[in-house]
């Protein structure tokens, strides 16, 4: 799968789960489970409940995603 196959959505973090995993409510109303991308983990970017985030998802599993950006 290439990087072009991923789907990007915006949403807000509704709940913090263990192991840097979050429940994210997307703009279209769906809730998914998302983890932090490696680059965000490496740069110690903190994500809290209520933060606006950009989530990258694969078309094969639309219930899980990767948080790639935290909005300011």
From Swiss-Prot:
Listed name of the protein: Translation initiation factor IF-1
Keyword flag Transferase: no
Localization per record: Cytoplasm
Family, per entry: Belongs to the IF-1 family.
Stored PROSITE patterns: S1_IF1_TYPE
UniProt xrefs under InterPro entries: NA-bd_OB-fold (IPR012340), RNA-binding_domain_S1_IF1 (IPR006196), S1_domain (IPR003029), TIF_IF1 (IPR004368)
Claim: Cell membrane is one of the keywords in the record: no
Oligomer and partners: Component of the 30S ribosomal translation pre-initiation complex which assembles on the 30S ribosome in the order IF-2 and IF-3, IF-1 and N-formylmethionyl-tRNA(fMet); mRNA recruitment can occur at any time during PIC assembly.
Keywords, ordered alphabetically: Cytoplasm, Initiation factor, Protein biosynthesis, RNA-binding, rRNA-binding
GO MF, one example: translation initiation factor activity
Sequence ranges assigned to domain S1-like in this UniProt record: 1-72
Entries under Gene3D superfamilies matching the protein: Nucleic acid-binding proteins
Chief place of localization: cytoplasm
Any one GO cellular component localisation term in the record: cytosol
Organism of derivation: Xanthomonas campestris pv. campestris (strain ATCC 33913 / DSM 3586 / NCPPB 528 / LMG 568 / P 25)
Function: One of the essential components for the initiation of protein synthesis. Stabilizes the binding of IF-2 and IF-3 on the 30S subunit to which N-formylmethionyl-tRNA(fMet) subsequently binds. Helps modulate mRNA selection, yielding the 30S pre-initiation complex (PIC). Upon addition of the 50S ribosomal subunit IF-1, IF-2 and IF-3 are released leaving the mature 70S translation initiation complex.
């Amino acid at each position: 799968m290439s990087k072009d196959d991923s789907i990007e959505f915006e949403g807000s973090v509704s709940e913090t789960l263990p192991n840097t995993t979050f429940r994210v409510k997307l703009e279209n109303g769906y809730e998914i489970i998302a983890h932090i991308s490696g680059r965000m983990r490496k740069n110690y970017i903190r994500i809290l409940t209520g933060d606006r985030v950009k989530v990258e998802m694969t078309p094969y599993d639309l219930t899980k995603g990767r948080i790639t950006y935290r909005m300011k």
